């Protein structure tokens, strides 16, 4: 007879030090002028307007050997738990436009107060495609696929790639993020050096970033700078212009890879 363990309930309150008001039309225009997709920015502002102050219940887990840590552990050591995270209106948000190829700086770090934008390279999950484009997305464990939707930035721990940030999925398209260990981290395979390095199988340059196991991965240098700015309350949107609504089932959704220009 199987014994079912009761869920352990934990309250996790994540909020930035200073909540800000919605950006003005002038700030919105400034942000868009720096390459941020208008639809993605509109979705971000609308989501914040509709959900600031809201609490989201999360399916999470505790580790038997370090119950007070947010570090991942093997499935055999996990105890199911629930957490509650609360969204406030942050000053810094991020949009990752997975419509764009990995060779574009598709990670947009956005200051909603000033309208300043900084762009970075970011990798997608191996299960989403081992080419320059991410074409498949899901909320499925062990798929190694990127999940679309809004995330709340959590705490930091020291992982395999150094400083690593937990992320809480806030929609049906990504609400298994914690259990899937979808986190923001740095990686050696992100940056122009990797793009221009030779693929040993072909002898030709990779012409793309490397791929993760489903996480958004920045370069190691940029992760050490960006993660401390986002932790505990920033909001991150994994975006694709053609798949946001379809992704809400949590099942795999896909698009064809864009044709190469001759």
PLM regions and their residue ranges:
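Bacterial N-terminal signal peptides
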Residues: 6-15
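Cell wall/extracellular polymer interaction/catalysis modules
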Residues: 21-213, 221-229, 234, 238-262
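A conserved hydrophobic position in a structured secondary element of the catalytic/binding core
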Residues: 218
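Positively charged n-region of N-terminal signal peptides that target proteins for export
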Residues: 1-4
């Amino acid at each position: 007879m199987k014994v079912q363990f009761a869920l352990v309930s934990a309250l996790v309150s994540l909020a930035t030090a200073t909540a800000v008001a919605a950006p003005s039309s002038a700030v919105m225009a400034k942000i868009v002028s720096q390459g941020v997709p208008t639809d993605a920015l509109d979705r971000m502002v609308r989501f914040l307007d509709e959900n600031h102050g809201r609490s989201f219940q999360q399916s999470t887990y505790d580790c038997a050997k370090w119950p007070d840590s947010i570090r991942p552990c093997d499935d055999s050591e996990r105890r199911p738990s629930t957490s509650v995270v609360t969204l406030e209106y942050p000053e810094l948000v991020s949009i990752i436009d997975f419509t764009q190829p990995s060779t574009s700086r598709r990670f947009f770090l956005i200051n909603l107060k000033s309208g300043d934008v900084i762009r970075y390279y970011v990798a997608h999950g191996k299960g989403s495609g081992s080419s320059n484009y991410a074409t498949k997305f899901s909320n499925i464990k062990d798929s190694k696929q990127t999940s679309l939707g809004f995330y709340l930035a959590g705490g930091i721990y020291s992982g395999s790639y150094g400083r690593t940030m937990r992320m809480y999925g806030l929609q049906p398209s990504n609400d298994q993020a914690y259990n899937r260990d979808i986190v923001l981290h740095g990686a050696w395979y992100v940056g122009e050096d990797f793009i221009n390095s030779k693929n040993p199988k072909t002898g030709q340059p990779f012409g793309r970033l490397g791929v993760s196991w489903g996480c958004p991965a920045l370069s190691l240098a940029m992760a050490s700078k960006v993660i401390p700015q986002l932790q505990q309350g920033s909001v991150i949107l994994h975006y694709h212009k053609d798949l946001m609504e379809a992704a809400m089932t949590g099942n795999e959704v896909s698009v064809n890879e864009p044709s190469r220009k001759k």
